């Protein structure tokens, strides 16, 4: 019984860590969107296109990161 309680607490803490990591990625995406919006309103030159390219690459990599995390969550070993 006590072991089961510790096991559930451990799982909850691990899920909480994953949620915090996901939240950090979402915040980075929002910040990059804000940077691009500010840049697009100030100038329309090649540097802004470079920032847009970096933003798109970051969004694609974070989508793969989310899929990787969900794969880890849903394929964890069952006792």
From Swiss-Prot:
What cellular-component terms does GO give this entry? host cell membrane; membrane
Q: What is this protein called?
A: Uncharacterized protein ORF8
Chief location category: host cell
Highest taxon listed in the record's lineage = Viruses
Tell me how this protein sits in the membrane.
Multi-pass membrane protein
UniProt keywords (A-Z) are: Host membrane, Membrane, Transmembrane, Transmembrane helix
Membrane-spanning ranges: 18-38, 50-70
What does the UniProt entry say about where the protein is found? Host membrane
- From what organism does this protein derive? Spiroplasma virus SpV1-R8A2 B (SpV1)
């Amino acid at each position: 019984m006590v072991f089961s309680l510790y096991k559930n607490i451990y799982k909850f803490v691990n899920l909480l860590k994953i949620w915090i990591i996901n939240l950090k990625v979402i915040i980075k995406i929002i910040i990059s969107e804000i940077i691009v919006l500010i840049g697009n309103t100030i100038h329309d030159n090649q540097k802004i296109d470079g920032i847009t390219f970096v933003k798109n690459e970051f969004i694609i990599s974070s989508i793969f990161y989310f899929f990787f995390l969900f794969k880890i969550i849903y394929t964890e070993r069952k006792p």
